[in-house]
Amino acid sequence: ELRAELIRAGHVFRTDHSDTEVLLRIFQRLGFETCLSKLRGMFAFAVWDTHEETLYCARDRLGVKPFVYAQTDRGFLFSSEIQGLFALRTDLSRTPDYQAIDHYLTFQYIPAPMSGFKSIRKLPPAHALVVKKGRIERIFRYWNLDLTKRSGVSFGEASETLREMVIEATRLRLVSDVPLGAFLSGGVDSSITVAAIARLGASPLETFSIGFEDERFNELPFAREVAQHLGTEHHEMIVKPDAVSVMPRMIDHLGEPLADNSVMPTFYVSEFARSRLTVALTGDGGDESFAGYRRFYQIRRLEWLAERGLIPAWRGLRKLTVALED
């Protein structure tokens, strides 16, 4: 979309399909902050302006792509992984950030801008930063989700609008110069993603599922049923999780603690899919967006009780939440 817009404006591209060149062109044409408002999807980038001797960095709205950095006495370092920073500067301090660890024990992850190390920061989602002469000049939020609007549409209208938005979001992510596939667990999230891809006519579509010998955790039959219904080229593999052998690799990539029990299955299915392709769509984020976890229902029950004055401490808890967000 941006490429077509730039071509109509008279820009000539040196490549046929480079997202990087499109980003640079839109950056040159609109400037940093206006450029960010045009970008859709996941990204993390850094652009060096040779004329201004300024580095411009940004991370996508939801923080899908990682961006970590360190400000040192010798300049500014950035990477997509924490291990990348330690590779750049072997003497970079590895002192733990105990406040970040405290947050991890509370929230089961370390929220940005903190990391597990005092010397390293994470650029938060929907944020950008500007570096001049090796020093951070400013960090700012360029987008925020407006939760105050109420549309007033019916449930049916909202459902149809949501369906159209899912299809459109999927269509945008099918633009790729390499073959792509999809992870399929048989659950609602990944099944909707694969159904959207199939509806858009992306064929042949390869889907990937992993299963376990323990039937309590094996979802292969559900994934197989969805794959047959949608006519995908389906691949399955039974795995025997060995946390001891893969944990060092996972820790290297994560760079910090993360109490998410889906990390291990995701690691295995990613490794499985990588044997055939390099790009795959997933259903990640569905439960978070549409309150699919039991804890969201429990919070709604707490709100119901609080509205009736049955939880005296509720007002204090709400203030604590606001304080943490600030």
Each model region followed by its residue ranges:
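Short, polar/flexible loop-turn hinges at active-site or ligand-entry regions and domain interfaces
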Residues: 6-15, 30-35, 88-95, 114, ...
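Active-site loops of AMP-binding adenylate-forming
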Residues: 27-29, 106-110, 250-255, 295
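ATP-dependent adenylate-handling active sites, centered on carboxylate activation for C-N bond formation
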Residues: 5-8, 44, 50-76, 133, ...
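Short, conserved phosphate-binding/catalytic loop or strand-edge motifs used
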Residues: 19-24
